[in-house]
Amino acid sequence: LQMESFDVIVVGAGIAGLTAARELLKKEPTLKVLVLEGKDRVGGRTLTVDVQTANHTSDKFDMGGQWVGRTQKELLALLDELKIELYDQYETGRKMAQLGTEKIRSYSASLPVFAAGSFTLYEVIDFVRNIFRMNRMSNKINVLDAFSWEGAVAADEQSVASFARSIALTRSARDALDIGMRAVYGAEAKRMSLLYHLLYCKSGGSFMDLIEATGDGAQAFRIKGGSQQISLKLAEALGSDRVRLRSGVKRVETSEGGPTRVTLENGDRLECKRLVLAIPPNQCGQVEFSPPLGYLKRRLYDNMTPGHLIKFVVTYKSAFWREDGKSGEIISAGRTTIPGEILPIVCSYDATTSNGSPAIVGFIHAELHDWTLNERCNAVVKDLVRFFGTKALAEFIAYEEKNWNKEPFNGGCPVDYVTPGNMDAFGTIRDMHYGVHFAGTETALVWMGYMSGAVESGKRAANEVLHALELREKVDHKYLKGSQFSVDYHHPHPPSDHYNDTISPWRRRIFFGCALVFGIYAVSKKYDLSYTARVFRPVEKSVFKWWTGSEWPH
């Protein structure tokens, strides 16, 4: 049988893959482009579902990526093109926190960092000191070349948790950082490379920008109707003939200058001039490559671990927390005085829709993965009662959750992260493998790990393909930054562990120190001085001579 042939095949019908296909056809409509998706839906790590709400109706809620930040320019531009509207994340009122103790504390500042009224001055100073130190370190990172920073090797050798323990003076500050890691990455701080975290912060602006819902924070806006409609609209514009669902890729055969052949899980074989893999790094590791990937890229995919967040939505008869003067925001360490006990909620936000359907959205600790759905539901509602009072149970309507760890062709959410000691491999994440290009939010330079990063990565991959197909007049070179086709591309520095043969200054210090002590001793013996005078008389003589120009009187 003759193999189906295409100019470009894109694997992955999430935001990155569909953006790549759209960009290619926008620049060159004559290209024969096909998008393959292993799941039975488009959207990747975005998923919008209907949940029962007040007044016996239902409304749409996001169970995957959902927030948009003011500085996420690529995503904002795409939303504008697709005529998708935004609305503000509600954050008015007191926020609830359980940090450093079982006691629940409330605060009105954007973050507990600035909540001097609810936390001790010592805790606030510790919060601020740690945040500013982390921001100062992340500002030194070059996103394109992490190991150009002199502190990179040491940062990659330690986890975020070990770093936090070395600088944080209070349990509250350590808890706050742990919660930030769980909410942003779906991972424990002890499992993540500090260097990766610093690079991720730099990509999004700062650590504060990753965790805030105000200002330039990543949680500033939500999408009317849900975020999955981005992919649905992109796929609709491409046409059903260009998007094939239930078409997981098993094997890729590629070569320099020759065609690339793709074998699907059902045995079908396709051929293309260029292939774009727009799937998470951990899923790239499930694909068999011929010839094999290089050592560093193979190690990258083996050691990039997906986050393990469980996301929940609880709908209510009314937004009672607003009536009580609360914003709906919770941050919780989930720890108690009982060894081994853990409470489910990591953080939560007001999830009331643009239609006015009251709800709370949040994330659950990974330790609850093996619990049943009913056990997690009961635990979450009980925990909401702990923060919001008995109305959290009395006005309960429905509970919905998404365990992304069980999602096929995904393996976790919201993002893949790098474990300590593997950031040298991360430098290859955008590198091509013969006729194969790589997209996905983890490959982005700006807002890595977010929907905006997915858009950017799709455009980069599309422009790489146009360049490779000799359609260079159609290439937008600003999207080739970080690509091997960039005019100013240079391979990232490898981690340096070389010997430093400079002479230690301590040799000179010890020599001159000994000479000084011997001189003082010799003078004191000659003039038979007291112990105090033996120390100070030579100094007095020197100062006297320098000041007066005369010798010390005998």
Predicted stretch roles:
Residues 58-68, 144-154, 216-224, 297-305, ...:
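Active-site rim elements
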Residues 56-139, 149-150:
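Dinucleotide-binding Rossmann-like beta1-alpha1 core, especially the glycine-rich loop
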Residues 19, 27, 259, 308, ...:
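Conserved flavin/dinucleotide-binding core of flavoenzymes
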Residues 139-248, 255-260, 278, 283, ...:
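Active-site/ligand-binding neighborhood in enzyme catalytic cores
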Residues 4-35:
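N-terminal Rossmann-like FAD-binding beta1-loop-alpha1 element of flavoenzymes
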Residues 247-248, 253-328:
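Central helical "cap/lid" subdomain
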Residues 25-54:
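Glycine-rich FAD pyrophosphate-binding loop
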